[in-house]
Amino acid sequence: MTENIHKHRILILDFGSQYTQLVARRVRELGVYCELWAWDVTEAQIREFNPSGIILSGGPESTTEENSPRAPEYVFEAGVPVFGVCYGMQTMAMQLGGHVEASNEREFGYAQVEVRTNSALIRGIEDSLTADGKPLLDVWMSHGDKVTAIPSDFVTVASTETCPFAIMANEEKRFYGVQFHPEVTHTRQGMRMLERFVRDICQCEALWTPAKIIDDAVNRIREQVGDDKVILGLSGGVDSSVTAMLLHRAIGKNLTCVFVDNGLLRLNEAEQVMDMFGDHFGLNIVHVPAEERFLTALKGENDPEAKRKIIGRVFVEVFDEEAFRLEDVKWLAQGTIYPDVIESAASATGKAHVIKSHHNVGGLPKEMKMGLVEPLKELFKDEVRKIGLELGLPYDMLYRHPFPGPGLGVRVLGEVKKEYCDLLRRADAIFIEELHKADLYNKVSQAFTVFLPVRSVGVMGDGRKYDWVVSLRAVETIDFMTAHWAHLPYDFLGRVSNRIINEVNGISRVVYDISGKPPATIEWE
């Protein structure tokens, strides 16, 4: 009998904070399963989920407004620990008899809170001490409103000069509220506070580990599909690759992977995918060379969004044709991950944040009577990578920089032509190779090359040439929502430029993109 890794679970109610997914990831890092739901859930839904504890997230609304979101009353009647973060603390305080007021000044950034009373939430946790020996905690604040009176059965655990109730607690009911964000790295002891809540107060065991997740996923796949055949669109990206490895472990040769080579991949990527999954791991793969079909469909198209739609449409057409050629396939597998499915649980009020979906196969074709297998749908990206390592996939593949779903189709500006893709592939390979050689690849978050459809005069030997321009792009970011351009060394950039111009016949000029996000986006299209 496989161990139930969902036995202990935390429910996170989302009030719209940009950090809510980070809260969930932190809980998972502690080895505990959690789910992220919109704030307006019903009592019946909470009862059915049967959480060991509940976390109320932050959010952009003001509890002083009449129609601002509130936690369901049952949250405070369920008999489980509750942890309110920022807005979550404010709505907890207000709903349980305290008072919240709009502050004249928004408090955003680093702060030190002074501990007044001991609490199970911060037992043994401190960053420094005051002159008279009281513990201090370095935290990250981000709030406008503040609690001005706590409920009568709560105590003040910690405060700052401007925030009289930075931490409040009702130890008997195991209700806790903090006016800062323990999930962000700027709150130095935040992870330990979350650990106190999840592991000590909620008494959750660390059952959510890569090895146990794999065992659970394999068993669930076998229960779902039995001896049936399954088809998967394998792109060579992280999600589809880990999905393929899980399915292969679960059902072996009953899995058929379809690899569509659209001509928009990185240098030698098609060969690498076939070698790794076909020859090395022994998966059953159908290789579909479709470069000409994609490039024909893209001919004459300059609009980025139109190019994305064309690439997506042609991929589905090619994949469907291959699927129909296979006999007795009853299941379609997809590399859907947890952020992809959060949107479906978003509140109809629009208060909960919406997560952009990833590029998957695009849904089941109407003619195909197949069931859907999604073994990664409970996992965040970092968890997918960890189980990929456990399954034997190479680190360099799992942790390489993001590559857009449409591939080079959106890194060749304007019309996509084979000539442009071939030049871009070679230039980009040189850039990435040099980043690795200089030990810079893992010091930037994403790096790539863009093909610009403009010609520039160059000099080679005694002659002049009139060839194409490429731009190098490298950024540093934590969440890809904002990004700084990477300050790569001048001698490094010079070396990359010289290699590209000398080794890639057809490129005469290399430029470096120094735009941040915002105002620019990371990708050019």
Curated annotation (Swiss-Prot):
Pfam families for this protein: GATase (PF00117), GMP_synt_C (PF00958), NAD_synthase (PF02540)
Protein name as it appears in the record: GMP synthase [glutamine-hydrolyzing]
Any one Gene Ontology molecular-function term assigned to this protein's record: ATP binding
Catalytic residue positions: C86, H181, E183
HAMAP family per record: GMP_synthase
Keywords: ATP-binding, Glutamine amidotransferase, GMP biosynthesis, Ligase, Nucleotide-binding, Purine biosynthesis
NCBIfam families documented for this protein: guaA_Cterm (TIGR00884), guaA_Nterm (TIGR00888), PRK00074.1 (NF000848)
Positions of ATP binding: S235, G236, G237, V238, D239, S240, S241
Self-association state and partner proteins as the record states: Homodimer.
GMPS ATP-PPase domain: residues covered: 208-400
Annotated gene: guaA
Residue ranges annotated for the Glutamine amidotransferase type-1 domain, each copy included: 9-207
